[in-house]
């Protein structure tokens, strides 16, 4: 910024948790043209037109990034969630389309933006929109929803930055190699990639353990072991088709997010990604979605491969007893190995999968801390980074968002209390007072 230019906005008199490379804490932050222009040393940037906000002891952190949140579905269901209204393991149980036309799609996306802003969420990943769901029961995951996102982005009406994964099969259901290849040829809407970006593809490898549909080396109580959801008459053909999907998408440079919960499906997915990376180089930031039964052996491979883990501690806490009922207590004891993942250096993103759960990152972090049996400020930092820094990396956007440093966007979440000073169990009681997107207020309590 030129020396003669003053800031548009200065926040001072509180704590700024930058989550930058040095994990610095500051007392002030200056913003101009939607980006951070100074941290701490802001006095010389205050001019007659600068808005100066006295934080009065409040805390600023980077805007929250819920890296697995079904926005249109959330907006259509809100204030209800699957857990508040009964759990069906997917979108089952809906009497009719939740969004039946363009007006309903727009209203749902805008409502999700309102809900996100009130929680300090400035970015989220919409994990699965596309032709695979064009005849879907809810209407919340269709190609038309992606088109509506693009229209809102180009009109400047989105209240969060959105990353999209395209879906060429059925949500929580089967997919075919032919449909996958056909879908990849479809055009992607043209938008500002810092507002709306289609990053890659979503694949459902299997189901979930409580529904006995995750593909596992274990046996469920009914004697079955699940299977892959990708098309094929036998396991070998299904594995080959899944591997082919991953190889095709990888060679295109697409990011690949794979819903994989069973240990057996996770092994197949990671092996396929590893082979694609070895043959073609690291072309996309791929990741496992959920990863309930990931083994220690596979977990140890992920950092070297650059493969991330996107998991939902709230779901782990809520469905643990159901997993035990399906597979036994011994399997539950090694499920969702969050602490091991962090310790090994796996790129871990925490998320909510809203509206499966409510989209409250504070509750998700509290659930993660309880699951991992950790507490204290360093543990809180680690968990907060899994909702800010690491999701920006997953988005391929760490150079311009996810932490507070000069040149990065001024996406800010202002809290009434410093989260590093509270016990994880008390984090849900910490209030969000203001949310800024690109230096503009999108929520104020």
Residue ranges of predicted features:
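Nucleotide phosphate-binding/pyrophosphate-handling subdomain across enzymes
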Residues: 308
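Divalent metal-binding segments
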Residues: 2-185, 190, 197-265, 285, ...
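Short low-complexity, flexible loop/linker segments enriched in glycine and/or proline
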Residues: 52-53, 134-149, 271-275, 324-328, ...
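His/acidic/aromatic-lined binding-pocket segments of jelly-roll/cupin-type domains
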Residues: 9-10, 27-29, 412-413, 432-435
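Short, Lys/Arg- and Gly-enriched loop/turn segments at beta-strand edges
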Residues: 419-426
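Carbohydrate-interacting/catalytic domains
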Residues: 9, 444-445
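His/Asp/Glu-enriched, well-ordered alpha-helical/loop segment
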Residues: 247-257, 261-286, 291, 296-303, ...
């Amino acid at each position: 910024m030129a020396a003669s230019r003053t800031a548009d906005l200065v926040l001072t008199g509180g704590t700024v948790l930058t989550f930058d490379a040095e994990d610095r804490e500051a007392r002030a932050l200056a913003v101009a043209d939607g980006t951070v222009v100074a941290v701490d040393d802001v006095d010389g940037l205050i001019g007659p037109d600068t808005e100066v906000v006295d934080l009065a002891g409040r805390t600023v952190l980077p805007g929250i990034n819920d890296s697995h949140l079904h926005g249109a579905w959330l907006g259509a269901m809100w204030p209800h969630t699957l857990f508040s209204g009964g759990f069906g393991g997917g979108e089952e149980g809906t009497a009719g389309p939740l969004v039946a036309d363009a007006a309903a799609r727009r209203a749902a996306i805008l409502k999700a933006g309102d809900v996100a802003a009130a929680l300090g969420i400035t970015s989220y990943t919409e994990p699965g929109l596309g032709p695979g769901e064009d005849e879907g029961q809810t209407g919340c995951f269709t190609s038309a929803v992606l088109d509506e996102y693009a229209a809102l982005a180009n009109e400047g009406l989105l209240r969060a930055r959105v990353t999209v994964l395209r879906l060429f099969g059925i949500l929580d259901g089967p997919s075919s190699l032919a449909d996958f290849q056909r879908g990849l040829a479809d055009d992607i809407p043209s938008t500002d990639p810092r507002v709306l970006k289609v990053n890659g593809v979503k694949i459902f490898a299997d189901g979930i353990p409580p529904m006995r549909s995750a593909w596992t080396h274990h046996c469920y109580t009914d004697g079955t072991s699940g299977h892959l959801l990708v098309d094929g008459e036998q396991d070998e053909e299904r594995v080959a088709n899944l591997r082919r999907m991953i190889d095709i998408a990888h060679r295109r440079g697409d990011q690949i997010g794979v819903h994989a919960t069973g240990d057996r499906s996770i092994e197949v997915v990671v092996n396929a990604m590893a082979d694609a990376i070895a043959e073609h180089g690291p072309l996309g930031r791929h990741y496992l979605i959920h990863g309930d039964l990931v083994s220690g052996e596979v977990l140890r491979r992920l950092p070297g491969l650059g493969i991330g883990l996107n998991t939902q501690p709230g779901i782990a806490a809520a469905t643990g007893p159901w997993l035990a009922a399906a597979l036994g207590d011994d399997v539950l004891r090694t499920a969702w190995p969050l602490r091991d993942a962090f310790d090994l250096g796996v790129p871990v993103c925490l998320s909510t999968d809203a509206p499966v759960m409510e989209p409250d990152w504070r509750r998700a972090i509290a659930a993660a801390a309880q699951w991992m049996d950790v507490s204290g400020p360093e543990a809180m930092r680690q968990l907060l980074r899994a909702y800010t820094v690491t999701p920006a990396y997953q988005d391929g956007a760490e150079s311009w968002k996810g932490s507070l440093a000069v040149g990065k966007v001024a996406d800010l979440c202002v809290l009434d209390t410093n989260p590093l000073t509270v016990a994880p169990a008390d984090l849900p009681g910490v209030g969000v007072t203001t949310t800024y997107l690109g230096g503009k207020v999108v929520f104020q309590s």
